[in-house]
Design a protein with these regions (language model features):
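An exposed tryptophan-centered "aromatic clamp" motif
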Residues: 27-44, 48-97, 103, 117
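Extracellular adhesion/carbohydrate-recognition regions
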Residues: 1-43, 114-115
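Extracellular, disulfide-bonded carbohydrate-recognition/adhesion ectodomains
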Residues: 19-25, 98-113
């Protein structure tokens, strides 16, 4: 189950409002704790293949179904995976290009979309 809004935004039964926030990788755990507390459940960062499944190459501005995930910034989102070829870098999925990149060190902030197992 996906969180409809990126971290920092709030679902108001019609759309995501507010501003999505970029987090450094070491700040993500705190956001997950807050989500678990406020929204109940066991939220987590998605694996690379999970986040890649949200990419919609036919979609316009943001490469994601905005009817399901409204107001998604067309930028990079963290996955939970380290780039095994370059262990200082994490994998991200870019919703502007629809591509996956393993070139972001954890100190560069990126957006976060959380998921939980049913």
């Amino acid at each position: 189950e996906w969180l409809t809004c990126p971290v920092g935004m709030i679902w108001d039964n019609k759309q995501c409002s507010g501003s999505a926030i970029k987090l450094k990788f070491d700040e993500v755990d705190q956001a997950i704790l807050k989500a678990n507390e406020q929204l109940k459940g066991k939220w987590r960062l998605p694996k690379r293949h999970e986040l890649e499944k949200l990419v919609c190459m036919e979609c316009d501005k943001a490469k994601i179904e905005t009817s399901i995930f409204p107001n998604t910034p067309p930028e990079s989102f963290w996955t939970s995976e380290i780039n095994q070829w370059q262990p200082r870098f994490m994998w991200t999925v870019n919703f502007f290009t629809g591509h996956t990149f393993g070139r972001f060190p954890g100190y560069i902030p990126n957006y976060v979309r959380l998921v939980r197992d049913r």
